[in-house]
Amino acid sequence: MYFYIETLKQRLDAINQLRVDRALEAMKPAFQQVYSLLPVLLHHHHPLMPGYLEGKVPHGICLFSPDEKQQHYLDSVELRWGELSAPDRKGELPITGVYSMGSTSSIGQSCSSDLDIWVCHQSWLDNEERQLQQKCSLLEKWAAGQGVDVSFFLMDENRFRHNESGSLGGEDCGSTQHILLLDEFYRTAVRMAGKRILWNMVPVEEEAHYDEFVLSLYARGALAPNEWLDLGGLSALSAEEYFGASLWQLYKSIDSPYKAVLKTLLLEAYSWEYPNTRLLSSEIKARLHKGEIVSFGLDPYCMMLERVTQYLDAINDQTRLDLVRRCFYLKVCEKLSRERACTAWRRQILTQMVQAWGWSDERLVMLDNRANWKIGQVREAHNELLDAMMQSYRNLIRFARRNNLSVSASPQDIGVLTRKLYAAFEALPGKVTLVNPQISPDLSETNLTFIYVPAGRANRSGWYLYNQAPSMDAIISHQPLEYNRYLNKLVAWAYFNGLLTSSTRLHIKGHELCDIARLQELVSDVSSHFPLRVAAPTPKALYSPCEIRHLAIIVNLEHDPTAAFRNQVVHFDFRQLDVFSFGQQQQCLVGSIDLLYRNSWNEVRTLHFSGEQAMLEALKTILGKMHQDAALPESLEVFCYSQHLRGLIRTRVQQLVSECIELRLSSTRQEPGRFKAVKVAGETWGLFFERLSVSAQKLENAVEFYGAISNNKLQGLPVQVETNHIHLPPVVDGVASEGIIQFFFEDQHDNQGFNIYILDESNRVEVYHHCEGSKEELVRDVSRFYSSSHDRFTYGSSFINFNLPQFYQIVQLDGRTQVIPFRSSALSHLCVTPSSEDKKNLVLSQRLQML
């Protein structure tokens, strides 16, 4: 037993040293320095060293002794400071070991790879862990200053025994992975300093009795407990864990598909073997115990590809097998079509592989030229990756059904994962599909041409985008890159996918819908308002309803009513100018509106509205996408491209939208029925702001308006005629007063409801017979509206006079018809000071009572 243990330790040390050497060989000098010094900087804590902060900061790595390069660094510090004090060695030091994991040291490591470092610490660290985390954060910043991307992960040595999981935002994948995270660590870990990993010493056949076997090794003195890092065994995985982990890999593959597709397929291979899955880490350990140092030194990336290849061959999926090989080749980043003198071992391995795959020189040249791929190749690659991921997703769903899963990932994590998949892949009208998730660094085009095809032609009407100058030969011989009915969508697609840049030459054939100057303005406005790179959506954002973050309202891009004013004399009064009901014809000067917005899930959406109701439809759409508890958009811009009155139209639209958004987001249960009237093309519309929705209703007359804002709408047969064609009760004629709105209620006999006579400010009359409902509620709602809505109307709307309406009841007293003020408790709480005209009318009504 002793000899066997010593042999295993020697193999472990040899494999670890091979991995360290390979890791350093693939690194640039700055990377090598950071990798070498990190253990020293975690072992010591000194003001002259990176990562220093005041306080009692845990430091010191168990069993650490510096190598030659590390000692040279320590000597240089001591020359400036004097002898460094060693960490307090009473008992165990706080850091059990420092390990790099992932692609580091494997064939998958490239010059641009980042470093994932596990800092495993004693369980008793507890409250001091936060200070160690701060030290690690300072070391990350120091490494970034050297051009090296390092991420530290603090790991309690008992974490996996207690089945603790981090949040979805971290690299440890939230609650969806536990054993699988440990599986990756065990197969890829490189010990930089500290204790050896105990799991490697336990034979695969003893995995089910891991703890008992470890105790027997300690009891027999074969191993000393304080010399080993024990994170626990790899227990059998549940189907739920495979499901959650696979969803997580799909989540990662959205932003970095080439990097994640291999891991995604490994998990699919695991689930295909379930319940008899043999983890890759266990296979590597079994070969280590047998002395079979295969797969180019048990390279974890090569072994991962081998396992995936076996699986895809078994299910006869040659399409995804070819894809995963290309992803592997691109991840290694060796460029075999070009001569190189460095990293010989990686180049030799990759050469053997591509020869076995039967790849041609042309394919190698194409893959090695990935940095210069343009939209055609990128779109093809995107579709291929998307198909592969969706196939993995379908297989995953079948796996879940086959095993009657109750998913172990928390509902919140699953919701976040599903939301991101939806946001990235669901194709919806108006949604801008982003086709370049780290596939190629530069999709910019030298020329972009936008061509409009009117209705009635062979091709469908709309806009076509070409990456050619507008010569007939070039256009005819090429397929369009993209088509859409509306120009805004094409510009957004080209901009957000990186084809349209500041150096792109723009061309347009717009059939008078849009010219080059307007197109250039649009591109400039969009690029200045929408940054291309934004932070990834947080798990909290993905778990919540999506909200508009950046909004652009694009006015009169394709249809500009003011273009008709050219060479005409247009008479208007600026003091009474209403761009939504302009001039004697009451014309709406907003002919088209395009919306362009990015939401909190980082989706980019476009919408188009045209015609006289474009403003109203756009308003309803914007407000409908804002739930009542949403945050205000971070930015809201109105871009107007009218030939005339551009500034005024832009200002009016901005004011209207801002007012409506404020009303929408401030509506509460305590104040239902918030309202705004908008006059468009001579017609007045009411926008009603409820907690759950925003509705619009055309208001052709006063009672339609009053009924609409009443919780208990009146029901009756409206009869609307001119004053000279109707006989009002004489008592109403006698009380009519210009300048205010007056309501007269007249009860019908035999419970047939009541009539309403309404006189507006000009004494125009509307009559409604046989109305039903509550007069009290009608009076209350109308009065509430008048007392609180002085600023709710757009410019030019004279639909309502803001003097408080007067309400009267027609009654029979002493055989005579009389008018008395309507007694309503609803009016008692309204603190409105009547105008002098109101006072005069009130006196008049009081006199009438006495007649």
UniProtKB/Swiss-Prot annotation:
Q: Per the record, which residues fall in region Regulatory?
A: 540-851
Q: Which EC numbers does the record give?
A: 4.6.1.1
Per UniProt, the keywords (alphabetical) are: ATP-binding, cAMP biosynthesis, Cytoplasm, Lyase, Nucleotide-binding
Output the superkingdom of the source species.
Answer: Bacteria
Specify the protein name.
Adenylate cyclase
Give the start-end ranges of region Catalytic. Answer: 1-534
Recorded name of the encoding gene? cya
PROSITE patterns membership: ADENYLATE_CYCLASE_1_1 (PS01092), ADENYLATE_CYCLASE_1_2 (PS01093)
Quickly give the catalysed reaction.
ATP = 3',5'-cyclic AMP + diphosphate
Instruction: Tell me a Gene Ontology molecular-function term this record carries.
Output: adenylate cyclase activity
Q: Which GO terms describe its cellular component?
A: cytoplasm
Sorted alphabetically, the Gene Ontology BP terms of this entry are: cAMP biosynthetic process
Major localization listed first in the record, in broad terms: cytoplasm
Q: Where can this protein be found? A: Cytoplasm
Q: Which family does it belong to?
A: Belongs to the adenylyl cyclase class-1 family.
